[in-house]
Amino acid sequence: MTTARHLLVVDDEPHIGLVLRPYLEQLGYRVSFARTLDEARSAMRAVPPADALLLDLHLPDGSGLDFLRDLRKQGGTARLPVLVLTAEGEDRILREARRLGAALVTKPFSPTKLSQRIAMMFGDIKEGEPE
């Protein structure tokens, strides 16, 4: 029996969780949520930590981009798959997220697009492959 991959969704918008949890669980993922960076940091100290992050860039207690930079500096999370969920349109910020190794999905997004990006992030499908 394989263990479900654990996704930590870091987003302060409650409706994101209401929409994503049932959809992602139906796809076989275990899902937990953090609404602040402080909650996300605590969740990342859990044993075992999440297998991947879905990360908003704008959170009430700071920048998701700064959090991503911090993750990349730590040995245990330097290669953690991260998918940035954002309505951000500023190219400089999006380029920095990509430079830090994050995949991007812009809000609003379709569930199909999200599931494809997650599968690509884990290497289950290649870009351009059907799901």
Predicted regions and their residues:
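Acidic, metal-coordinating helix/loop segments flanking the phosphotransfer/catalytic sites
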Residues: 33-52
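Active-site residues of response regulator receiver
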Residues: 56-57, 86
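Acidic catalytic/metal-coordinating carboxylates
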Residues: 35-36, 63-66
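Alpha4 helix (beta4-alpha4-beta5 surface) of REC/receiver domains from two-component response regulators
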Residues: 66, 88-106, 116
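Charged docking surfaces used in two-component/phosphorelay signaling
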Residues: 18-26
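Short amphipathic alpha-helix used as the core "switch/output" element in two-component signaling
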Residues: 65-78
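The feature encodes the CheY-like receiver
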Residues: 17, 60
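Non-catalytic signal-transmission and effector/linker regions of two-component phosphorelay proteins
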Residues: 1-8, 112-131
